[in-house]
Structures are given as structure tokens and as C-alpha cells.
Design a protein with these regions (language model features):
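Non-catalytic substrate-recognition and accessory regions of acyl/acetyltransferase enzymes
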Residues: 1, 30, 39-41
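Short loop/turn motifs at secondary-structure junctions and domain boundaries
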Residues: 25-31, 120
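A short hydrophobic/aromatic micro-motif that marks alpha-helical segments and, especially, helix-coil
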Residues: 12-13, 28, 153
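Conserved GNAT-fold acetyl-CoA-binding loop/helix
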Residues: 1-23
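Acyl-donor (CoA/ACP) binding surface of acyl/acetyltransferases
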Residues: 34-169
Length: 169
């Protein structure tokens, strides 16, 4: 299985993803949190998600969010929405981050729509910044601040616990 076709730097085999996950379980890399997305009914892995935490000062203040559902027949079934909600809870409720950044190809309409649905706001574009499939692509940068998350989630506020499987507590 080839995961994350749209992320050339993150295209990864299941075996490589599992190796990264084992590294995270051992606590070898606090800054990168990788998660395996499992289909609930079959418990089969269908993708990955990540939080790449910014540690530019002593206090972690933000992270890049990433996810990919590897198989087309699993797209548009609500997995992305569910995973992003869990990542938002992890980032803001557990890690107490101030902001999240979402990077995506400009032509990835599904990713842009999901980001905006989850409250992210477009902040910029890096023109022809990624070379993939023999051509350059623009990247769109979206951001979500803690107060925007709080305003969005407050009517739905749940106890601050995460259902994501991760290596460190």
C-alpha cells in the first residue's frame, strides 16, 4: 500500500509508517507525533495523521497538521473530519498549543474544503514550491488559532481526552 500520494515528502509504506510509530512509542521523537488511522469495523490501517510540533522556544506553541487516507475507496466517508477533530482536541486540549498550520497543494480541493470546514483560515500561498509529477505546484497555507478553536468547539465542548493512539503519554 502506498500512502499519501499527494505528499511527495511523506509518501510512505506501511512498514515505514509502523517503524516511525514504534519510534514514537519509545519516546524517541517528541516533536513529531504520527498516528495510524484505522477503519473502525475492520481495524485495518487506512491512512496516517500527524502533528509536527514547533519547538522554537522552550514552550511548544504550534504545530503543522497532516493527514492522508491512502485508498480512494475510503475517501469522502467522514474519516478526515473525524481525524481532524481528534487532532484538534490533541493539539489544543492536551498540548495546549496556540495555533495549528495546515499545508496543502492548491489543487487539492478536498483538503482545502476540509480545512475550511474545520475552521482553518487561508493565510497565504507559496508559489511553485513543490515539484511533484514532473511539475511545480503551489502550496496553500491555512491556520487555526486557539481562540478560533475555542469559539468553534465551545457549543460542543467535551471532556478533554483524546482517542488517538499514540506512543507517549
Amino acid at each position: 500500500m502506498r500512502l499519501a500520494r499527494s505528499f511527495p515528502d511523506h509518501t510512505i509504506s506501511r512498514e515505514a509508517l509502523e517503524a516511525r510509530y514504534e519510534k514514537a512509542i519509545k519516546g524517541d521523537d517528541f516533536g513529531e507525533r504520527y498516528y495510524i488511522i484505522e477503519e473502525k469495523s475492520s481495524r485495518q490501517p487506512i491512512g496516517w495523521a500527524s502533528l509536527d510540533i514547533h519547538r522554537w522556544t522552550r514552550r511548544a506553541t504550534g504545530a503543522d497538521i497532516g493527514l492522508a487516507i491512502g485508498e480512494k475507496d475510503r475517501w469522502k466517508q467522514g474519516y478526515g473530519t473525524e481525524v481532524v477533530r481528534l487532532l484538534l482536541d490533541e493539539a489544543f486540549e492536551q498540548l495546549n498549543l496556540h495555533r495549528l498550520t495546515w499545508w496543502t497543494f492548491a489543487e487539492n480541493e478536498a483538503s482545502l474544503a476540509l480545512a475550511k470546514k474545520m475552521g482553518f483560515k487561508e493565510e497565504g500561498r507559496t508559489r511553485e514550491s513543490v515539484f511533484f509529477d514532473n511539475q511545480y505546484h503551489d502550496n496553500v497555507i491555512l491556520g487555526l488559532l486557539r481562540d478560533e478553536y475555542d469559539a468553534w468547539v465551545s457549543p460542543l465542548r467535551r471532556p478533554g481526552r483524546s482517542a488517538l493512539k499514540r506512543g507517549r503519554s
